[in-house]
Amino acid sequence: MRLLGLTVVLSVSVWGGAAAQTVPAPAPTARLSGAIAILEKHNKPSPDIGDAVIYLVSGAGTAARPVTMDVTIADKKFVPDVVVVPVGSTVRFPNTDPFSHNVFSASDPNGFDLGLYGRGEAKGHLFEHPGLVYIYCNVHSGMIAYVQVMPTRWFTQPGADGSFTIMGVPPGHYSLHVWHPRVAQEVVQDVDVPVAGLGLAQPVQLDARGFKWQPHKNKYGKPYPTNAGRELY
């Protein structure tokens, strides 16, 4: 009944000569496409090029709608080991191993400690701040994942061939950021996206030739014990 009454009032207003409101046309958007390439030692192919994250930064940008995503723990690994989520999203860490894990991060201001939990359990964390978050297990020193928390809605990851596309980009000036877990610093370049869209003429090049695995500390800020990861079933 309330819906019917509202309909009648609106009808009277329109027929009474009230000015009709014009719905503005949606702002035009464009597509940015390109590719990345990673320089490797001895010119070897990059097996993990799909772990890269590409995103656009603009002063007028807004974050996408928050999501909930699972990063599964299986065989002492985080799967997937790189995820990209908008600010305000929750990432859950279901444990499918037959032993316990303790997922944590010391990446402020997104640091957290989920404590020890066993097979069949899942715990998660709400990521309220943008930035790169390193994820570890306090039991197994070899476990690592990366959560990129995005303040922008324009982000993607490349395919196995390094190609990428970002859709729905309003025409304008942006900083294009490319990150990869084995590259020390993001590659950043300016791009101007016209109404017709933009295809980058050259691949964005990253250099992983100097990468070396660096051991990290446990959640107490101390080195892992030599027997870390030895399972007690």
Question: What are these model-predicted stretches?
Answer:
Residues 5-15:
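Bacterial N-terminal signal peptides
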Residues 21-233:
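Extracytoplasmic copper-binding redox domains, predominantly the cupredoxin/blue-copper superfamily
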